[in-house]
């Protein structure tokens, strides 16, 4: 395998991190045992293991939320200054007798004018939560329903919308039950979560005690709450899915997973060669011989829909689901937002889209638009960005504006009528664009970078451009046309994809093949003493980033050293971009100030002109030259 082949390999960051710390085999084993209904009674041993803590530190260090502080005003950079041994010791001591630090509450405004309370734990508690999440996730993933899509690996809102469209198009389920759980995250029953975890096989009493304390952590300025999951914690989304997983399987058991005496399912082979289990004969037999109601659930976090075939069925399902949520999960339904929708006559909103069935030839097909509230939000956002662009008519301003437009296009491109919707938005902001940008921008046909923005060029839409002259050279920056977008139909989630099986990983991720696993293990098991946790974590990813090579030759343990491009005594840091692996003798040459030593090292190394140029640039950065 060549260097260029390696660069093209599919990479999933979380899985690559698992490889760095040899955690993947452990997680795979947990997933397999959970599938076999094993009871887990000693999970704390895995949670406080050295590899798991190092992996947790790496995962939260890369997380954007690590730059947000809790009640103790500490950030990830404060943990990064500790040695990796100190971090491990800290986590282990805290979990011996765990008591969470107070949680900071932050109110986030919602579209309806109300606020959503976020509970932000301290960075240390988030590190501990990450340690727990890494071990619990494979166990829970083995038990979760296959059509829940929120806060789960490899799944997205697009998969949930795609599943809803598929049910509308192919199964003739033309009624949908929309149920809104009243303030779900604030009303979750703590004792119910613990029981559900126990039934999933998580039966480590020490761990359950720790999670129980996390749920009852004091919220600064509010006190201790007896119910609810604090939004903002790393463990919160997983706990929310544990709660609602019972709902998923209850709905599924009413039709989809209903047991039959005879096995009607058949294995069929697609043209692509992929095998799948066909349940159509089972559903046909159930429809003919039982009075069961056809129903399928699609859920994203606490936002879910139940599709059914008639209004009478929908009414019964609505009442039954409402009663089940109250009796089993102790959750109330919001009557104002809960309803039954005839999809042939009305739209139903789901995750920022509105869906409806329209007649086409002799059948009904799903048509989708951007939801009305989201149309208004996008319009307001673009107007706000136009103001900023007028104040900063530069390359940076244009790139910021373009990133907003591109972000909206990428999310809403799966709507079948996305082009029509963005044309409406473009028309509504046209006067604002003209008034704000006409003086500093010229109007011309779009001239984007062909390789990166190819889809816009064929529209021939007039857009605004900003021209900058620098040393007699003119550079043109174009703003992206709002309406230049076409529909890209969403794809259903492939249930073969799984982070915790070898076959499932191969569909999305290629394992490291060029690096020496022996060297990688040595780097992991032998952190540099008196260096920070950030330094020791980055030296592992740096080794893999350089493909285990230096000057196209394999790095050897006894000859490889990490060099700070900008020395720490001159303001340098342990950040990844400030580090580079070099040969021991090259490292001496970089810091060398003696002419004789320099000459001797040059003769020994026999460097090419390209290598000498690189060494000189490193010498200049560290002040040796």
Task: Identify the role of each PLM range.
Residues 1-85:
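Non-catalytic, polymerase-adjacent accessory regions of viral genome-replication enzymes
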Residues 57-60, 90-114, 123, 127-135, ...:
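Reverse-transcriptase-like RNA-dependent polymerase core
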Residues 102, 146-147, 152, 159-333, ...:
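Conserved polymerase palm-domain catalytic core
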Residues 180, 552-584, 592-598:
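Histidine-centered nuclease catalytic patch
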Residues 216, 221, 329-399, 403-406:
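A conserved non-catalytic segment of reverse transcriptases
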Residues 393, 397-457:
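Non-catalytic, peripheral interaction segments enriched in hydrophobic/basic residues
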Residues 425, 437-530, 607:
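Extended C-terminal regions of large enzymes
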Residues 506-549, 573, 600-607, 612-622:
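Short, charged surface segments at domain edges that flank catalytic/cofactor-binding sites
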């Amino acid at each position: 395998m060549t260097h260029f082949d390696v660069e093209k390999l599919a990479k999933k960051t979380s899985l690559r991190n698992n490889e760095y710390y040899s955690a993947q085999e452990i997680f795979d084993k947990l997933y397999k045992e959970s599938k076999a209904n094993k009871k887990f009674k000693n999970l704390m041993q895995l949670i406080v293991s050295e590899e798991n803590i190092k992996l947790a530190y790496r995962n939260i260090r890369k997380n954007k939320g690590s730059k947000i502080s809790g009640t103790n005003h500490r950030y990830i950079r404060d943990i990064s200054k500790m040695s990796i041994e100190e971090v491990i010791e800290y986590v282990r001591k805290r979990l011996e007798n765990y008591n969470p630090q107070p949680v900071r509450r932050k109110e986030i405004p919602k579209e309806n004018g109300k606020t959503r309370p976020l509970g932000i734990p301290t960075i240390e508690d988030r590190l501990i939560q990450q340690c727990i999440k890494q071990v619990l996730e494979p166990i829970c993933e083995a038990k979760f329903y296959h059509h829940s899509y929120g806060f789960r690996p490899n799944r997205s809102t697009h998969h949930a919308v795609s599943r809803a469209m598929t049910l509308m198009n192919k199964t003739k389920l033309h009624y949908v039950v929309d149920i809104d759980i009243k303030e779900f995250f604030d009303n979750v029953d703590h004792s119910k979560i613990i029981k559900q975890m126990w039934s999933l096989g998580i039966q480590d009493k020490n761990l359950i005690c720790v999670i129980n304390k996390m749920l009852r952590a004091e919220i600064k300025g509010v006190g201790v709450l007896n119910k609810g999951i604090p939004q903002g914690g790393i463990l919160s989304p997983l706990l929310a899915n544990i709660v609602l997983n019972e709902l998923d399987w209850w709905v599924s058991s009413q039709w989809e997973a209903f047991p039959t005496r005879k096995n009607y399912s058949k294995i069929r082979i697609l043209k692509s060669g992929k095998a799948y289990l066909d349940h159509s004969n089972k559903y046909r037999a159930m429809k003919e011989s039982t009075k069961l109601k056809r129903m399928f659930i699609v859920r994203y976090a606490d936002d879910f829909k139940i599709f059914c075939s008639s209004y009478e069925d929908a009414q019964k399902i609505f009442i039954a689901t409402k009663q089940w949520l109250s009796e089993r999960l102790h959750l109330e339904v919001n009557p104002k937002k809960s309803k039954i929708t005839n999809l042939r006559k009305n739209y139903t909103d789901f995750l920022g889209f509105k869906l409806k069935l329209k007649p086409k030839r002799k059948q009904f097909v799903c048509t989708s638009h951007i939801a009305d509230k989201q149309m208004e939000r996008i319009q307001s956002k673009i107007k706000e960005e136009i103001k900023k662009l007028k104040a900063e008519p530069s390359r940076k301003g244009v790139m910021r504006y373009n990133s907003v437009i591109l972000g909206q296009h990428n999310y809403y491109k799966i709507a079948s009528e996305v082009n029509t919707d963005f044309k409406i938005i473009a028309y509504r902001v046209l006067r604002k664009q003209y008034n704000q940008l006409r003086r500093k921008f010229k109007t011309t046909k779009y001239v984007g970078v062909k390789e990166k923005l190819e889809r816009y060029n064929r529209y021939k839409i007039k857009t605004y451009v900003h021209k900058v002259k620098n040393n007699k050279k003119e550079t043109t920056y174009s703003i992206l046309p709002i309406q230049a977008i076409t529909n890209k139909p969403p794809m259903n989630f492939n249930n073969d994809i799984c982070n915790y099986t070898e076959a499932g990983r191969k569909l999305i991720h290629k394992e490291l093949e060029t690096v020496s696993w022996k060297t990688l293990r040595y780097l992991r098991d032998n952190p540099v003493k008196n260096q920070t946790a950030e330094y020791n974590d980055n030296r592992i990813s740096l080794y893999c980033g350089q493909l285990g090579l230096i000057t196209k030759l394999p790095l050897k343990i006894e000859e490889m050293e990490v060099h700070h491009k900008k020395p720490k005594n001159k303001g340098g840091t342990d950040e990844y971009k400030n580090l580079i692996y070099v040969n021991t003798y090259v490292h001496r040459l970089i810091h060398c100030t003696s002419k004789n030593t320099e000459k001797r090292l040059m003769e020994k190394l026999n460097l090419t002109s390209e290598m000498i140029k690189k060494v000189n640039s490193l010498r200049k950065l560290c002040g040796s030259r």
